[in-house]
């Protein structure tokens, strides 16, 4: 929690300049560099990297 107050961002992306305060945020960011679209709409051909993109 204290990292948020001190601006410490020890988790760094090895593909760009992104950095963050925790590993789960970094793992989520790493999907942006991937070509894997694992979440698919059941009604059409739409596919996305993020599950929240399918929600209404």
Swiss-Prot record:
Record key words, sorted: Developmental protein, DNA-binding, Gap protein, Metal-binding, Nucleus, Repeat, Zinc, Zinc-finger
- Please list which residues make up the signal peptide: none
Instruction: Give an example GO cellular component term for this record.
Output: nucleus
Keyword Zinc in annotation: yes
GO terms of biological process kind: segmentation
Q: Zinc fingers (C2H2-type) at which residues?
A: 1-5, 11-33, 39-56
Please indicate if the UniProt record lists Protease as a keyword.
no
Matching entries from SMART domains are given as: ZnF_C2H2
InterPro entries membership: Znf_C2H2_sf, Znf_C2H2_type
Q: Its Gene Ontology molecular function terms?
A: DNA binding; zinc ion binding
List localization entries. Nucleus
Taxonomically, the superkingdom here is Eukaryota
Q: Which family does it belong to?
A: Belongs to the hunchback C2H2-type zinc-finger protein family.
Job description of the protein: Gap class segmentation protein that controls development of head structures.
Protein name in the entry: Protein hunchback
Recall the taxonomic lineage recorded for the source organism.
Eukaryota, Metazoa, Ecdysozoa, Arthropoda, Hexapoda
